[in-house]
Regions:
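Membrane-embedded, hydrophobic transmembrane alpha-helices
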Residues: 2-137
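Polar low-complexity intrinsically disordered regions
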Residues: 1-17, 126, 248-258, 310-317
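Active-site lumenal/periplasmic loops and adjacent helix-entry segments of GT-C-fold
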Residues: 41, 45, 49, 137-144, ...
């Protein structure tokens, strides 16, 4: 009996220390974001909280779709909620049943939340649990990863925030046009009285979140890009973590318990960071190799090449 009490006490102290460390890490991240982003941090926090609340509300739906996942699709729930509410807002505006305003965006979100609550109550009566019960630590670390990646890319974007180069000015112009418009498609900024005759889905969702959060395109233009980049880190982490966890089922003891999270981090780094390695290879590595071989260090580098076909690059003169 005394041994059980002693073990319970030790376990309680360990959990207490873990929670304190997690709290300190959360405070450090929030404080660090305030220091790095200065006045822009309020918009950053707003989008992060908005994604979190929407994702939480969508868990009755996401939890069923990802029922085999330990986290029940926690990170994916954020994107799913934005996609569903954004699409239905666009649909209602496109068929002229509603105006593209903040009020409409909020109304659609509230209807979505009510539907999710009703679904949650229905699932509860049937004994279906859609929340990641017993995996609080995993959810905490996924939120840390998402927040840290979002913060990192937002901070980097601040060094070159101008809407300059390739299609950036067009993207910014489309967003401003949709912010002013109450109909969709919005009036094209290039053609007087004409409508945007170009795919504008990405810009639309950026404006949807901008109107929903009552902010301005001047702040959210870059924020949307970094928001997507954060998902590009957190989603691969969640997916590969679960894949490795399932593959090693029954073997996750001792040091092997670190394998799934390390595999998840490797996936996030591979997509979010290594996926942007085109610049390093073609701008620095290949010219350096050419120089070592006695040739001219001429890379002919143009950064949009990363979005084009990579076939037959070995035949490039």
């Amino acid at each position: 009996m005394e041994a059980e009490i002693t073990n319970a006490t030790k376990k309680g102290k360990t959990v207490g220390k873990k929670r304190i460390l997690q709290l300190l890490l959360a405070i450090a991240l929030i404080g660090g974001s305030a220091y790095l982003l200065k006045g822009d941090v309020w918009t950053f926090w707003t989008w992060w909280l908005l994604a979190g609340v929407l994702g939480l509300c969508a868990m009755p739906l996401t939890g069923r779709l990802f029922q085999g996942f330990a986290d029940k699709g926690w990170i994916f729930s954020k994107a799913l909620a934005i996609a569903v509410t954004g699409f239905f807002t666009w649909f209602l505006v496109s068929i002229k049943l509603a105006a593209f305003t903040t009020l409409t965006c909020v109304a659609v979100v509230l209807i979505f939340v009510v539907c999710c609550i009703l679904l949650f109550l229905h699932q509860s009566r049937q004994g279906i649990w859609c929340m990641p019960e017993g995996h609080g630590d995993l959810i905490f670390w996924e939120e840390v990863i998402f927040f840290a990646a979002f913060l990192m890319w937002t901070y980097f974007a601040g060094f070159h925030p101008q809407a300059y180069g390739t299609e950036k000015f067009m993207d910014y112009g489309f967003m401003e046009a949709m912010m002013r418009s109450t109909t969709l498609p919005a009036t094209d900024l290039w053609y007087s009285q004409g409508k945007i005759n170009y795919y504008y889905g990405g810009q639309y969702f950026a404006v949807f979140l901008t109107k929903l959060s009552v902010t301005k395109v001047a702040k959210t233009y870059n924020l949307m890009r970094t928001f997507v980049a954060a998902f590009a880190f957190a989603m691969p982490f969640s997916l590969v973590y679960q894949m490795v966890r399932d593959r090693m089922y029954g073997q996750l003891t001792g040091k092997k318990r670190c394998v799934p999270p390390m595999a998840g981090l490797t996936a996030g780094i591979s997509l979010s960071l290594a996926g942007n390695g085109h610049y390093i290879v073609y701008r620095w590595v290949l010219p350096w190799i050419q120089k070592l071989q006695g040739g001219e260090s001429d890379s002919g580098y143009w950064f949009p090449d990363a979005t084009r076909s990579v076939s037959y690059t070995h035949l490039r003169a």
